[in-house]
Every structure is written in C-alpha cells, then in structure tokens.
C-alpha cells in the first residue's frame, strides 16, 4: 500500500506514456465509463428532471470526494500543507470538479450553462486526461495512486458528459456558446494568474508538457504571447464546432423521424 500511494517516492519504474499497460488501463476505464453512461442515461431518459438529476448529484459528490482525498494524500505525502496549490482545478479536465457540482446543485440559467459546459468539455477532458496525459504516465507507474485517481475522476467527467447527452439534459441553446466560452476564458485568466504566482503551468498555457498542446506550442515556436492565444482560439473553435455538430445531428435525427412518420 505504501508503494501504491507513493509514500517515500515510487520505487517502480514507470511503464511509459502509450505503453500497453497505459493503453489497457485507460481503455478499460473508457469502456466502463461508456457502459455506465448508456445504462443510466437510457434508464432515466424518460423520467422527470429530479430523477435525472440524482445521477448528477452522485457524480458531483463522488468526483469531488475523490479529489479532496487525493489532495489530503498529496499534502501528507509531501509533508507540505500547501502542496494542494499545485492541484487547483485550473486544467481543462479538472474544471469539471466545479462544473459538475454546479450542474447538479444549482437551478435556472446557471444550471443550464453548467450542463452545457460539462456536455461540451467533459468527454474531451476524459480522453485528453487519460490517453494523452503524458505528464502523468511518463512519470508515475500506471497502477499508482496518482494515475488511478486521475483516471477515475476523468472517467467521471466523461461519464457525466455522456449521461447528460443520453438523458437529454443539455439545453444547448445558441446563446450558451458565449456563456461556455466566457466560463472557459475566466478559468484561463485564473490559470494565467496562478501560473505567474506559483511558477506553474495550469491550463498548459506555458507549454504542452507532453500533451497535444505541444502541437500549438511548436507551431508558434513557443511564443509566450501567441501560444496561450492559440490555445484559447482553438478552445473557441472547438466550442463552435461542437455546438454545430450537435445541431446537425439533432436536425438529421428529426428529419429521419419525419420521413418515418410520412411513410407510416
């Protein structure tokens, strides 16, 4: 257990980023994530909003409890009560630690905006934070506390995103494109400030650090101005494309249903 939690440092050599152990572990998580989302989503699809929301409440409590437990272990392990400052929810995937509880516990426009935000970014964060987390799987053994908790919380983010889609909880109103982007922009601003104060790399706004962000970093030759602007620009493009793909799929499904009704 001491080795699993990393007390005194991990003695095992990391299997490596994109090793078969890494891919097997995260793929198993993704399969479980999708199956659970489909199961709960279809089960609650035709129920009232209160019944649908119970799953979000459970997801919010579980994901934040797991994260708090991780922060406690990190502080104890490092013997530094301020070690949690380097685990703030200021990455694209960890924003869900705030967004999912907002989607679960609030009402009205805040709830709708949070639901859409989780729907748009939850699955992306799950994939990016598992398959493309080179900064984790290159440093820690696959079955270590850091990677297991990270994989678990990212999977909950992806599960919640898929559940919102399948249970039809997302509003996806066009005005929420700007709301979603504004939320993300606010976190980017907070990340820039935290990076300045802590000399860290929240939201990967200082460099890719073994993630797909490296593509943008190399494209702009590591420019400290163009790189973060490029990251924010691609976030905006992703949001717009995601919304329009959603509208297209909704239109196509509606058209198919109309044709079926006409034939009958």
Question: What do the predicted segments below correspond to?
Answer:
Residues 99-161:
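Membrane-proximal helix-loop-helix units in multi-pass membrane proteins
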Residues 42-56, 105-114, 167-178:
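Membrane-interface helix-boundary motifs at transmembrane edges
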Residues 12-30, 179-180, 185, 198-239:
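Membrane-interface transmembrane-helix boundary segments in multi-pass integral membrane proteins
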Residues 34-39, 99-103, 156-175:
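Alpha-helical transmembrane segments in multipass membrane proteins, preferentially the mid-helix core
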């Amino acid at each position: 257990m001491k080795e699993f939690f990393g007390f005194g440092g991990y003695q095992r050599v990391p299997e490596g980023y994109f090793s078969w152990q890494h891919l097997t572990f995260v793929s198993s998580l993704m399969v479980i994530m999708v199956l659970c989302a489909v199961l709960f989503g279809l089960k609650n699809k035709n129920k009232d909003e209160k019944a649908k929301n119970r799953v979000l409440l459970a997801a919010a409590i579980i994901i934040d409890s797991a994260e708090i437990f991780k922060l406690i272990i990190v502080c104890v392990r490092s013997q530094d009560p301020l070690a949690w400052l380097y685990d703030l929810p200021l990455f694209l995937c960890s924003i869900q630690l705030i967004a999912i509880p907002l989607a679960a516990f609030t009402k009205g426009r805040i709830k709708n905006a949070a639901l859409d935000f989780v729907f748009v970014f939850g699955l992306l964060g799950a994939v990016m934070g598992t398959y493309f987390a080179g900064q984790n799987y290159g440093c820690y053994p696959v079955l270590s506390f850091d990677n297991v908790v990270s994989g678990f919380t990212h999977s909950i983010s992806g599960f919640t995103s898929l559940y919102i889609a399948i249970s039809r909880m997302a509003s996806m109103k066009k005005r929420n494109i700007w709301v979603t982007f504004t939320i993300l922009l606010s976190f980017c601003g907070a990340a820039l400030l935290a990076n300045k104060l802590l000399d860290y790399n929240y939201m990967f706004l200082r460099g890719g650090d073994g993630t797909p962000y490296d593509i943008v970093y190399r494209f702009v030759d590591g420019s400290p101005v163009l790189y973060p602007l490029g990251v924010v620009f691609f976030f905006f493009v992703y949001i717009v494309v995601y919304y329009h793909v959603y509208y297209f799929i909704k239109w196509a499904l509606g058209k198919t249903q109309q044709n079926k009704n006409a034939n009958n």
